[in-house]
A protein has these predicted regions:
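Feature captures the FAD/FMN-dependent oxidoreductase FAD-binding
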Residues: 98, 160, 165-169, 217-265, ...
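Glycine-rich dinucleotide-binding loop and its adjacent helix/turn
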Residues: 142-160, 218-238, 260-324, 448-463
Length: 505
């Protein structure tokens, strides 16, 4: 593994690169071609073209891209504070080892964030003020994948073990990041996962076309080679919690925000209504177990599908349903459509509040001829047919109104706007309401009003001695990059608790 070393403060290799080269994203397969499989569909650019993209980093005075600033209620810039200008320049200078070293200094799993992160960094890129931002996420992915392909990434086995044992409960991005950092410090780490495969959200919450599971398993194998243990199929109840707290020097709970938000409407008990997390997991598991041929999954084939929720998970469900062979798909969004371009009160470097058409929606447009999204609309009633099977959904339009009790703006139904849609499969992708109650109860922990484990900003220690928490379980539903950041921060706190100091950053 290359050493990050010290980098002398110098001018960027090509200060005029942003004026000479235009932005070029990784390639994208046409929608009607890529829906034929669950494979990833973004071939990478050539090395020569990638070097040009690295050269576009402009040696700006203040690299907002790595700042993670909260502006107007949203974060802009990288939560991991990646050394973005440095490794962009190393790409241009043809220094793959140094680029990799600088990237790995702050990022645990660039192969994940380089695929699924919404690129908060690019929203804050100085080039984006007047032109197109640098392809930071694609550059990140190039560095890490080039590192794997060239054999630059090898197991980093600690030379000395501390004699301390740490149990990490949950193997999603926060759990893996925490385990990786603690193992690096020489602690003996075991990760406990309730599912049949490690990876958590990365394995079963993100479809293969966005994150091939070979990529997840490659990282798990690397961590195993470095000394991290994994125990799957392990549900933590009261007895298991007692065992972990008695046998380990520290326990870190990284179980995510696992309680999905439900629909409270008439007919909710109809057969054919599923949460998005269960739908996506069943597809991925069936693909891994038998190539989706065994029929042991929630199928959208030949069905009229309605997806409740306009976020990334809802879009993932659209793309997955299309690959199943659904007859039609509609995606309901409660909020109004965002503008196509930035408004005057949403300037750079704020996160751009604009309408984004993601891959699943692109595929629906190409296949069915129209955007699947219906804005300012929600479900009012579910109708069952023979055998209690879902047969139709009644929707209603919404409008913004002031709640007199709270003074807040809420979405209220517009009388007389009801519509009936044929529907054989309803998928609820409305987000999550908090941490798993069963795990919290097992450790004697109470959730706060938001359903999360209470912990102050920058503090991952719970009210139970030697039990810590990180990721969505602590901060609520969020992004993979935030989960990784949380895991790294929690690892430093646990290390300090165990050793009296820490050199983890």
């Amino acid at each position: 593994m290359p050493s990050p070393g010290r980098r002398e403060a110098t001018e960027m290799g090509k200060p005029t690169g942003f004026m000479e080269y235009g932005r070029r994203n990784n390639l994208t397969a046409p929608p009607l071609e890529r829906i034929k499989s669950f494979d990833e569909f973004h071939p990478r650019l050539s090395q020569e073209e990638r070097e040009k993209q690295g050269a576009r980093c402009m040696n700006c005075g203040i690299p907002f891209c790595q700042s993670a600033m909260k502006l107007n209620g949203a974060v802009s810039g990288c939560p991991l504070h990646n050394l973005i200008p440095e490794w962009n320049d190393e790409i241009f200078r043809k220094n793959p080892e140094q680029a990799l070293a600088r990237l790995l200094k702050t990022s645990s799993f660039p192969e994940f964030t380089g695929r699924v992160c919404p690129a908060l960094c690019e929203a804050a890129c100085s080039c984006g003020l007047y032109s197109d931002p640098v392809t930071i996420r694609d550059n990140e992915l190039y560095i890490i994948e080039n590192g794997f392909e060239k054999g630059l990434i090898k197991p980093r086995i600690p030379e000395i073990r501390s004699g301390k044992r740490v149990a990490v409960v949950g193997s999603g991005p926060s759990g893996l990041a925490c385990a990786d950092m603690l193992n690096r410090r020489g602690h003996s780490v075991t990760v406990f996962e309730s599912s049949d495969r490690p990876g958590g959200l990365l394995m079963y919450g993100i479809p293969n076309m966005k994150l091939d599971k070979k990529i997840v398993l490659r990282r798990i194998k690397l961590m195993e080679d470095e000394g991290v243990g994994f125990v799957t199929g392990c549900r933590v109840d009261g007895e298991k919690a007692k065992e972990l707290t008695s046998e380990y020097d520290a326990v870190v709970l990284c179980c995510g925000s696992g309680t999905p938000r439900d629909l409270k409407v008439e007919g909710r008990d109809a057969n054919g209504v599923y949460f998005a997390v269960d739908f996506l997991k069943s597809t991925t598991k069936a693909l891994l177990d038998g190539g989706l041929e065994d029929g042991n999954h929630i199928s959208a084939k030949g069905k009229d599908v309605i997806i409740v929720g306009g976020g990334d998970t809802g879009n993932d469900c659209v793309g997955t349903c299309i690959r199943h062979g659904c007859r039609s798909v509609i995606q309901l969004e409660m909020m109004p459509k965002l503008p196509d371009t930035r408004s005057e009160n949403n300037p750079w470097p704020q996160w751009p509040r604009v309408c984004k058409t993601d891959y699943g929606q692109e595929e629906a447009i190409a296949l069915f001829g129209s955007d699947p999204r219906i804005y300012q609309t929600t479900v009012k009633k579910l109708i069952s047919g023979e055998g209690g099977r879902l047969s139709a959904v009644i929707t209603v339009s919404l409008e913004a109104a002031r709640d007199e009790a709270t003074g807040r703006t809420v979405m209220k139904e517009i009388p007389g706007t009801e519509k009936t849609h044929d529907c054989g499969l309803l998928i609820i992708a409305a987000g999550f309401t908090g941490a798993s109650e069963s795990v919290c109860t097992a450790f004697g922990l109470e959730r706060d009003a938001r359903g999360n484990l209470p912990a102050s900003e920058g503090n991952h220690r719970t009210s139970v001695p030697k039990v810590f928490t990180a990721g969505d379980m602590r901060r609520g539903q969020s992004l993979v990059v935030w989960a990784v950041s949380e895991g790294r921060e929690a690892a430093a706190e646990v290390d300090s608790f165990l050793m009296g100091y820490t050199d983890l950053i």
